[in-house]
């Protein structure tokens, strides 16, 4: 059984007449993902996205593919005013959330380093200037997100935001002046890391953008510890071993901390300005995210 919002596309997608089986893989307010089986026996992934999640096909065309990032093949996509459907390669049955494994978390860290180096090398070579500007989150953007959090009724009185306000401008200036622009996934979590033997393929680039920050590694380190008890130092070492850029371990630790702050500020901004209305229960995420932000601020001060 498929939802009305997916069935609305059936007349627009001839391939769906060939589907013999639908298997729902994931569903939430702004996204539905199915594995579909065709009469030929082949499988594909069908993904419906609403609102900001509808831009994933555009992100593949303008970001992921031009930057030569390994990703599932997009066979076709169909866009309407407020939603879109993609037909994608079925690139793997299990992800790291379903089958957590210490060595694969370490490989995910190494893969992230390779992705960032590849993206940096190809941004100016393969992306039009207009797309670079369109997809770049600047230091000013992150400062604006932080100021918006200070103005939000729910978080305005939180002391961590006042401390962040004091240190963030200088830290962002250092980040953007010392680190190259690269691709940020912004949802580099176990659920989006497909297992391909001993390799990892990230999927779901719907909210990706360009920035130097390393929030993706911050998130991955937390999940590696939660799911597979992989120590933080081992994850940092794995990432460091795959980097092409010359960087000390101390510099890398700082990058992860400031990257974590960038990730938290952008995520919290989305949540408190409408995200909690979109995702039932997400209001409960905010206190933990603020505790995390407070901890990172204390590490940098």
For each predicted feature, which ranges?
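Active-site activation/catalytic loop segments of kinase-like enzymes and analogous catalytic loops
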Residues: 213-247, 260-281, 292-296
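All-alpha amphipathic helical-bundle segments outside canonical DNA-binding/catalytic cores
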Residues: 130, 246-260
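ATP-binding pocket architecture of kinase catalytic cores
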Residues: 25, 30-129
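Active-site acidic catalytic loop and adjacent metal/ATP-binding pocket
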Residues: 23-37, 45, 169-215
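A glycine-centered beta->alpha junction motif in the catalytic cores
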Residues: 80, 85-101, 145-150, 261-280
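An alpha-helical support segment within catalytic cores of ATP-dependent transferases
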Residues: 2-14, 120-185
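Regulatory N- and C-terminal appendages and interdomain linkers associated
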Residues: 1-18, 280-301
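Short secondary-structure junctions
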Residues: 10-19, 67-70, 176, 246
